[in-house]
C-alpha cells in the first residue's frame, strides 16, 4: 500500500470517518503536496490561519485540500485537482482572510460530510486552531473528535517505497553540504563562518535542484566546546588549525535529513581535537 492507502485503511480500522489535517508532514504524506517551509512568513500573509488544510474522507478514499491562493499554481503543478482556494494576501483591495478561509473550509467539509451530521472526525490536537474547530462543529454538529495524530503515526511507522526514496534524497543533499565543508577545510582561504555557511547552503540547494530549507549550526574554534546550541554561524574569521562542527538538517520534498560532522581547517588535528 502507498501512504494514502495506509491512512484510509487505518482510519477505517479506528472507526474514523474524516480527518482534518494541518501538520505539513501529514499533508505531504496523504496528498503529495509539500507545504513550503516558511512558517513565520506564512503566518503573516494568512493572518495566522493554516495555509493548507487536508480533508481526508476514509469512506470515499478521497483527499481534498483547502489552500491559500498563493499556492494555487504550485498545487496544480503537483497534479492535484481536488483543491479549493481562499484569498489570503492582497494589498490592492478589501479582503477578509478569516472569512475566506472559513467559507472555503465549510464548503469542502460539507461536501465530505455529504449531509451526515454525526461523524467521527480526526484532528491533530497540537496543530488545529479554534477557527478550524468552529467550522467543523458548524458543519458536523454531532461530530465526535478523535486523535488523528496517532492514526498518521501508525500509518507512517512502516516506510513506503516513496518514503525510502524521499529520505535517501534528503540524505544525499545533506551529504553534498557536508562534502562542501570538507572541501573548504582542505583548501585554505579567507572565510568567516557565515561565508562557509552560505557555500554549504548553496551546495545543498544545487544538489536538490531548488532552494532548500536548511537549519542547523556551524561553529569553529573555541565555540566547538560549548553546548549552547545554536552558537553559529557568526562573522568569526576561521583560522588555520581551527576545529569546526557542523550539524545540519535540510528539508527536501517534505523529508528531513540530519547530519553532523567535524573538520579541522587547513591542518592536521592535534591530540586535543582527536580526543
Give the predicted meaning of each segment.
Residues 10, 177, 203-207:
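Short alpha-helical functional segments enriched in proximate histidine and acidic residues
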Residues 135-140, 184, 199, 203, ...:
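Alpha-helical structural signal in soluble globular domains
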Residues 1-176:
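A composition/biophysics-driven feature that prefers long, compositionally simple stretches
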Residues 171-182, 193-201:
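Active-site pocket-lining segments that scaffold enzyme catalytic pockets across diverse folds
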Residues 120-125, 182-193:
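Conserved short loop/turn motifs at secondary-structure junctions
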Residues 30-42, 129, 147-158, 190-271:
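Short catalytic-site patches enriched in acidic/histidine residues
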Amino acid at each position: 500500500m502507498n501512504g494514502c492507502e495506509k491512512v484510509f485503511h487505518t482510519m477505517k480500522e479506528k472507526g474514523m470517518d474524516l480527518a482534518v489535517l494541518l501538520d505539513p508532514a501529514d499533508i505531504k504524506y496523504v496528498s503529495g503536496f509539500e507545504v513550503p517551509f516558511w512558517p513565520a512568513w506564512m503566518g503573516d500573509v494568512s493572518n495566522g490561519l493554516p495555509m493548507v488544510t487536508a480533508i481526508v474522507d476514509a469512506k470515499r478514499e478521497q483527499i481534498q485540500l483547502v489552500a491559500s491562493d498563493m499556492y494555487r499554481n504550485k498545487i496544480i503543478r503537483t497534479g492535484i485537482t481536488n483543491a479549493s482556494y481562499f484569498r489570503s494576501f492582497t494589498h490592492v483591495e478589501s479582503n477578509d482572510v478569516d472569512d475566506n478561509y472559513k467559507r472555503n473550509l465549510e464548503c469542502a467539509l460539507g461536501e465530505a460530510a455529504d449531509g451526515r451530521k454525526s461523524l467521527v472526525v480526526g484532528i491533530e490536537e497540537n496543530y488545529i486552531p479554534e477557527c478550524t474547530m468552529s467550522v467543523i462543529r458548524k458543519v458536523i454538529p454531532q461530530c465526535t473528535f478523535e486523535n488523528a495524530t496517532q492514526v498518521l503515526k501508525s500509518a507512517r511507522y512502516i516506510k513506503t517505497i516513496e518514503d525510502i526514496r524521499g529520505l535517501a534524497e534528503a540524505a544525499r543533499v545533506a551529504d553534498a553540504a557536508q562534502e562542501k565543508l570538507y572541501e573548504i577545510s582542505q583548501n585554505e582561504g579567507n572565510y568567516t563562518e557565515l561565508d562557509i555557511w552560505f557555500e554549504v547552503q548553496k551546495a545543498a540547494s544545487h544538489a536538490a535542484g531548488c532552494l532548500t530549507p536548511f537549519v542547523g549550526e556551524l561553529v569553529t574554534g573555541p565555540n566547538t566546546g560549548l553546548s549552547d546550541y545554536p552558537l553559529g554561524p557568526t562573522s568569526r574569521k576561521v583560522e588555520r588549525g581551527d576545529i569546526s562542527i557542523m550539524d545540519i538538517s535540510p528539508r527536501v520534498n517534505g523529508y528531513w535529513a540530519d547530519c553532523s560532522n567535524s573538520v579541522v581547517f587547513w591542518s592536521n588535528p592535534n591530540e586535543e581535537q582527536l580526543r
